[in-house]
């Protein structure tokens, strides 16, 4: 792939969306896996496969996916979640790569929430660099409770359902610490943007 691609990941409520917005403000092209995931499950062949596996109860009256119902069904069942991922993840990965390859600009930022779960570059070998946005667990927990209007137990369950912080940080080439200080966060993003532009300027695709 000829474009210089940086993968962005982080735990729930660590600030992936905020970081992506800050990069966009610097005229960086951003491709978001969550956006593509929503497109993938619109009425069509992928949704048909999901219905064949999970039944028509996952559909709303208008024939579209009831995302909340399906999320609740697979959240507490590892086998069900893996079955869903086996259907949608290959399609999402292929479309992510296509979107990244078509991106304009010196480099593209690809937001992938489950990048660590995919093994980092094992799952996404076309990424040249991986950026992890991190927050201390106490801050992450408090943000999640406030953002989703949930109690402490629910927040703990959501965080526990993800890969561990240590494993996520282990795949990072770069780390941004989102401590809640906008100036500090903005400064980190500006420095990284300059670094990525410099790296992209000398990047040569070897595929």
Curated annotation (Swiss-Prot):
Aminoacyl-tRNA synthetase among keywords: no
Positions with a binding annotation for ATP: 13-18
The listed locations are: Cytoplasm
The record's Gene Ontology cellular component field reads: cytoplasm
Q: Which Pfam families match?
A: CoaE
MF terms per GO, please? Answer: ATP binding; dephospho-CoA kinase activity
- Where is the DPCK domain positioned along the sequence? 5-203
Give the EC number: 2.7.1.24
Catalyses which reaction(s): 3'-dephospho-CoA + ATP = ADP + CoA + H(+)
List keywords of the entry alphabetically: ATP-binding, Coenzyme A biosynthesis, Cytoplasm, Kinase, Nucleotide-binding, Transferase
- PROSITE patterns (UniProt xref): DPCK (PS51219)
Signal sequence: where?
Answer: none
> Which pathway features in its UniProt record?
Cofactor biosynthesis; coenzyme A biosynthesis; CoA from (R)-pantothenate: step 5/5
InterPro entries per the record? Depp_CoAkinase, P-loop_NTPase
Its main localization is cytoplasm
Q: What class of enzyme is it?
A: transferase
| BP terms from Gene Ontology | coenzyme A biosynthetic process
Family to which this protein belongs: Belongs to the CoaE family.
Function of the protein: Catalyzes the phosphorylation of the 3'-hydroxyl group of dephosphocoenzyme A to form coenzyme A.
- What is the protein name for this chain? Dephospho-CoA kinase
């Amino acid at each position: 792939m000829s474009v210089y691609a940086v993968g962005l990941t982080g735990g729930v409520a660590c600030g992936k969306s905020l970081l992506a917005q800050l990069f966009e403000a610097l005229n960086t092209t951003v491709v978001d896996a969550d956006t593509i995931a929503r497109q993938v499950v619109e009425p069509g062949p992928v949704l048909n496969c999901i219905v064949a596996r999970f039944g028509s109860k996952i559909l709303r009256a208008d024939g579209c996916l009831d995302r909340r119902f399906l999320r609740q069904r697979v959240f507490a069942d590892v086998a069900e979640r893996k079955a869903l991922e086996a259907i949608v993840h290959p399609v999402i990965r292929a479309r992510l790569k296509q979107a990244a390859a078509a991106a304009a600009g010196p480099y593209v930022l690809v937001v992938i929430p489950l990048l660590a779960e995919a093994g980092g570059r094992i799952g996404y070998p076309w990424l040249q660099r991986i950026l992890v946005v991190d927050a201390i667990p106490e801050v992450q927990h408090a943000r999640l409770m406030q953002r989703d209007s949930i109690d402490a137990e629910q927040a703990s369950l959501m965080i526990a359902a993800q890969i561990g912080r240590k494993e996520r940080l282990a795949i990072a080439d770069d780390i941004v610490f989102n401590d809640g200080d906008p100036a500090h966060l903005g400064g980190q993003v500006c420095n990284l943007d300059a670094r990525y532009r410099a790296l992209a300027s000398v990047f040569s695709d070897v595929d």
